């Protein structure tokens, strides 16, 4: 059975509760079987399992951060409970549901605790003490939906709502919102949704995004630019407000048609690596990921040893939030690119500081870069 794991996150009053309720309303109790919470989508039967917010459960039942020895101790308990919940509920797949897919929706994920601790270093300590790695956590979710707080997008509308576990004031809520978003930067499929639109429109956007992901997989919805810059221009992005991940893409010969790229992906952060096998269709100047599977290191090595490497692309990805937008800057050997969500309408003033655009890139980014890399290597060889 296929499994999709989605973390639903965001700052206070971002619409998370309303979105989660709307997702639940998509499901029905299947009259043809004993199974409940079934979503019917494009001929597929999808078993929906939602995992409630751990912080609200703890606080509402008497375990509060203000009563703890310190915030770290509370977050450590929260992390442990959340980790156990995720591991246990995922065992439900073994129940043998009469469905094509199991969809897990987590009301907040394991990285959310970063927003409530004093520093990134403190969160790294918490992760280590719980026997995990940040990249391991980041890459265990297939999709991350970040609902920006109205404190960020529409401050005048922000107000405390009737959730007894919510106690953030507006300015603090804005700070928490930013730190929450920053905790998830570097995720392969992170999507930010603004709350300065009617709530129903925001809900519809999220629902459609989830449906598209289930139906079509990862869609290339990034605006891409070749930029002139220097790594030193990004000195303001540190471990506290960004994430830098080393990415190696090996293009393999698996005997598939020429319009399909089979890629072995290795992502490395703080000396820990995760691995993926991805199949990308390149037709009509469009790239669509039609297969994306997380694999272990042994499988990665086996596929690498048994198949021919056609090409290889290595880059350093710097991901960060600025002006409430998600940016990714990729540093290659001889050039640099900037990416952001095509749904974002950005002015020049909203682009990262010191970024100078050379040209817009269309179509497959990696294909463009591989070709450009070959040209640059040829030019270098002619100079020798």
Predicted regions, residues:
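Conserved lysine of the Walker
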Residues: 16
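Phosphate-end processing signature that detects enzymes handling 5′-triphosphorylated RNA
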Residues: 208, 213-384
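A glycine- and Lys/Arg-enriched "phosphate-lid" helix/loop adjacent to the NTP-binding pocket
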Residues: 120-182, 217
